[in-house]
Amino acid sequence: MAGLTTIHTVGLAGLRTAQSGLSTTAGNVAGASVEGFHRREIHPLIASPTTDPMIQGGSVVIDSVVRSWSGLVTTQYLDNRSKLTQSSTLFESATVVDQMLVDESVGLTAVMNGFFSSSADLAADPASPSARTAFAAASRALADRINTLATTIDETRVRAFSDMDRIATEANQKASALARVNVLVQSSSAFGKPLPSADLLDERDRMAGELAKLVGAKIEYSEKGEANVRFANGMSFVDGVQAFRLELARSGAANLPTGVLKVTTQPTKEQPSPMAIGSVQGGVDVLGEFGGLTRYAESAKDWLGRLGQLAVDMMAATSKADPEALWRDKEGNPLVRSLIDGSEVPIEGAFYVDSEDSVLIDRVPLLLRSSFGSGTSVPWSALEYNETSSYPVDQRIVQSFVAARDATTDSWSNWVTAVSGEIGTWKAEKTSFEGVDSALTERAQQISGVDLDEEATNLLKFQQLYQANGSVMQAAIRMFDVLMSLSGR
């Protein structure tokens, strides 16, 4: 009977091994398309299925089920992914502006050339009503196009500010969730288990990856398996089972984000007011989406400032040469424009900045306006009329507009070159990180990814193991029946 017991025990151990293998293979196949899933590998060995010295022989048993994972590759992958996310956010935020630079229908080049061409036409025939009307229309088109470009850039900047709020909120939620996972990881080790469950570790890595994408913090793993999150300056965001909190630093009357994140403790019943720990700077200490948005907002502000300077230079170049003289219409009346309060101010240039109906708070909107609503508002002369005198049209006024062409177009070209160069640098940065990301993704896939062809082979292997051990148990049952029949029972 000891022999029958041995055969039965060996077969049963083999069946259990096959069942575990089939279950693990099924889990791998199911998790193949799940983000953050790591392949489980079965490590079998041939050993005695029991410690009973009466049982002889060996069977295939499971030594361990191992989660395929590399801490080094994971850390490298997340570190590069945070940089890739930052550069991608930068480039994507600037896509609209980049398109405007190459699209003549929304860019400045065509309308600026149109303005100076109409200036030249008017200088050639300053008394022509049609030339004066065309010049007035061209000046309005140029002012509107500059405003449109400035407004578009400012809108992308405001959108970046809004996304900073969202990212800070999401990062706080993910950090708290990761701290809770760390508690479970720590608890599982406390109960004498050699390792936490593979599913729990997958969740840990998934949460860590999301934090790296949002704020680009560095992920470090403790000996217990906890994931710690630290910024580039060493400031902790998640330290074991404790998660800190991020708050956007703001400034000015408009309460706009500055790109700095304040790190504080979590509010508690005992201490409802969070205690400040330190701060981190977006784009320097904080990468990921937040870093990209911070860098873009800073660049957009610089673009707007330089575009504003271009407008100021253009205003100066197309203003009256003699501060004491007044621009007058054909009848000799001073040219004026009306303000919102009903008062009037002299027209002293082809363009002006309209700030009467707006409040500029921590923003740099450009409200450039043309002084010429129609051809009749284009200055005829700068000389004062009297009752007995009349004066011919003053050609020098329009000639001063024409003379400003080279300086203005050069300023615009320099602006385009600077902005295009910066966006091009971001694109090259993004391409560089994409290449590294592809290599690290391939490496991580080799270590922890699921190969469906390999799993199909494993499935067949464990099916055959199941069938073979099933046959062993059937043989034991038949032998038992024969022995029973021989003994007359």
Question: Across the structure, where does each feature detected by a protein language model lie?
Answer:
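Structural signature of extracellular appendage/secretion-system components
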Residues: 1-489
